């Protein structure tokens, strides 16, 4: 009996999978391909599917991590002998574990060093030690932006967040980015404060941000979708332009049977399926990509050269290489194509 029940459950599962597979609008790639096909079909034209160019991947970690300058050994030895809390901070750094600090722990160390050295400076009376402390604090403050960069864009977890191996951003989903967006906003405020040399900030949440980056891959999915949608909208726009150049859809602005079919597809597929996905991408860009772009831009002074080209492609909102600027241009051009097509028949929305 259990075998029969298992067989029925398996059959039901297969039916569900088959039905899902028959719905081209359940995922971004088949949805956009189907859309281009239907545009061609209703306009009696054969669409040409352009190749989606390979995305520029995030530079390898070794090309993102900046070398962290160290204090002179003599200065560290001197400070480690002085009887205030700073000797313990220096001692931890000189330990075996301290020599292989991960970027976030290194940032915590740098902040703690500056704070502790400042506290020591208020209590010390020896002029020589005062001079050493002031020099150490100045050096650490100067190199703090490097530690901040390494703890944001120099971590392995960033590669998972931006991986392209997880396909496109899902269709018809809600609230996928709330945690990532909240993290990005909080991280930006903290980094901005640190760059202003305000060290009275909480770094305790930072590790959780990295954990979420390691578990999520939404930024990479969004970039995949932006590239896919821009290319496929361009394909559909070319079909429209070809029809407009070859022969009118309507004569004397009067609708006909074909224009009714075109209008029906416009509302059912473009307005009903594609536009909601475009709205999802715009929201996701605002919620996640824009704060991440800000996180990189505010650290432009230390941004590695290898990272800059990738930033211009994946995170920048403007520029020839920006996937987001290209998406905006594709949407604008496609909208104008629909307007020109429907206007021939007096069917332009809002007219």
Regions found by a protein language model. Give the residues of each.
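Bacterial N-terminal signal peptides that target proteins for export
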Residues: 2-11
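Polar/charged alpha-helical tracts
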Residues: 5, 33, 37, 41, ...
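C-terminal motif of bacterial Sec signal peptides marking the signal peptidase cleavage site
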Residues: 18-21
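Detector for Asparagine
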Residues: 23, 63, 94, 105, ...
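N-terminal Sec/ER secretory leader and immediately downstream segment
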Residues: 25-179
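A cross-kingdom marker for long, charged
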Residues: 25-51, 217-351
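Extended, low-hydrophobicity segments enriched in charged/polar residues
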Residues: 136-245
């Amino acid at each position: 009996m259990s075998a029969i029940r298992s067989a029925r459950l398996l059959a039901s599962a297969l039916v569900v999978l088959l039905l899902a597979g028959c719905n081209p609008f359940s995922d971004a790639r088949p949805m956009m391909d189907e859309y281009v096909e239907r545009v061609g079909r209703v306009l009696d034209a054969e669409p040409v599917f352009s190749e989606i160019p390979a995305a520029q991947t995030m530079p390898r970690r070794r090309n993102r991590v900046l070398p962290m300058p160290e204090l002179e050994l003599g200065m560290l030895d001197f400070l480690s002998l002085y009887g205030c809390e700073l000797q313990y901070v220096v001692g931890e750094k000189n330990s075996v574990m301290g020599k292989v600090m991960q970027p976030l722990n290194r940032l915590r160390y740098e902040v703690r060093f500056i704070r502790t050295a400042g506290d020591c400076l208020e209590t010390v009376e020896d002029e020589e030690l005062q001079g050493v402390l002031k020099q150490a604090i100045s050096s650490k403050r100067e190199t703090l932006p490097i530690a901040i960069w390494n703890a944001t864009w120099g971590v392995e977890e960033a590669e998972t967040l931006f991986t392209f191996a997880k396909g496109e951003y899902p269709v018809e989903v809600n609230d996928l980015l709330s945690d990532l967006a909240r993290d990005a906003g909080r991280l930006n405020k903290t980094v901005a404060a640190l760059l202003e040399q305000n060290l009275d900030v909480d770094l305790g949440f930072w590790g959780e941000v990295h954990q979420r980056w390691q578990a999520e891959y939404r930024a990479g999915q969004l970039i995949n979708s932006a590239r896919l949608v821009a290319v496929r909208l361009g394909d559909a726009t070319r079909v429209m332009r070809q029809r407009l150049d070859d022969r009118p859809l309507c004569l004397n602005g009067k609708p006909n049977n074909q224009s009714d079919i075109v209008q029906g597809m416009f509302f059912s597929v473009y307005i009903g399926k594609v536009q909601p996905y475009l709205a999802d991408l715009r929201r996701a860009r605002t919620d996640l990509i824009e704060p991440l772009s800000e996180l990189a831009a505010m650290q432009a002074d230390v941004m590695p050269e290898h990272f800059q080209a990738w930033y211009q492609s994946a995170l920048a909102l403007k520029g020839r290489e920006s996937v987001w600027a290209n998406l905006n241009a594709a949407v604008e051009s496609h909208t104008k194509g629909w307007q020109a097509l429907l206007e021939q028949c007096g069917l332009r929305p809002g007219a």
